[in-house]
Curated annotation (Swiss-Prot):
Residues 1-68 are annotated as: Disordered. Keywords: Cell projection, Cilium, Cytoplasm, Nucleus, Phosphoprotein, Sensory transduction, Vision. The modification Phosphoserine is found at S71. Belongs to the phosducin family. Its main location: cytoplasm. This is Phosducin.
């Protein structure tokens, strides 16, 4: 009797152990579906397939199951489970998007603003909301790095819609004598009406050819960009792929 009880305890333990990983969680979910469904509404053949898929198998049983062909009913059931998991992933992504919309306070922009005058430049700095980070590129046509920086900021404006990216020609600032071609492009960063960072001849920080990812890394080194909103959604997708 003791040996039988011990063997039963070991079998129970092994049965629980098969449900510890992600696949075990899915098996438990299948078992839950079987138990929660109305018994009269499930065909006996489908009920048996669900039972087999949710029950732990010994090695011999696994070999036997692998050796036989998959029935049409099994294929349809597995396909249905995959559709259920796909719906679950879509639901989680929608929840994340709703959360981001609720937590993303303040205005949203999404493109680079062209400032035409010094007055418009000052008005942008002084009247924008205090929580908004403003990145301004002071440039001139034909100066090395200016076009590349403007293109990079246009890409970043899409990735960081909560940041206001602007550009203005040095000759339009009203202080053109302070912004000679030797110091262009100059990148100024404001928040709450205050200058928090300035980078003179910022193109010298990059290679001959540089792109948005280079400018993004540079600004992140100084903590000037918020966390990208898409980050959490990508992480959720990675977790969903791990479950599969």
């Amino acid at each position: 009797m003791e040996e039988a009880a011990s063997q039963s305890l070991e079998e129970d333990f092994e049965g629980q152990a098969t449900h510890t990983g992600p696949k075990g969680v899915i098996n438990d979910w299948r078992k839950f579906k079987l138990e929660s469904e109305d018994g009269d509404s499930i065909p006996p053949s489908k009920k048996e397939i669900l039972r087999q898929m949710s029950s732990p198998q010994s090695r011999d049983d696994s070999k036997e199951r692998m050796s036989r062909k998959m029935s049409i009913q099994e294929y349809e059931l597995i396909h249905q489970d995959k559709e259920d998991e796909s719906c679950l992933r879509k639901y989680r992504r929608q929840c994340m998007q709703d959360m981001h919309q609720k937590l993303s306070f303040g205005p949203r922009y999404g493109f680079v603003y062209e400032l035409e005058t010094g007055e418009q430049f000052l008005e942008t700095i002084e009247k924008e909301q205090k929580v908004t980070t403003i990145v301004v590129n002071i440039y001139e046509d034909g100066v090395r790095g200016c076009d590349a920086l403007n293109s990079s900021l246009a890409c970043l404006a899409v990735e960081y819609p909560m940041v206001k990216f602007c550009k203005i020609k040095a000759s339009n600032t009203g202080a053109g004598d302070r912004f000679s071609t030797d110091v262009l492009p100059t990148l100024l960063v404001y928040k709450g009406g205050e200058l928090i960072s300035n980078f003179i001849s910022v193109a010298e920080q990059f290679a001959e050819e540089f792109f948005a990812v280079d400018v993004e890394s540079f600004l992140n080194e100084y903590g000037l960009l918020p966390e990208r909103e898409i980050h959490d959604l990508e992480q959720t997708n990675m977790e969903d792929e791990d479950i599969e």
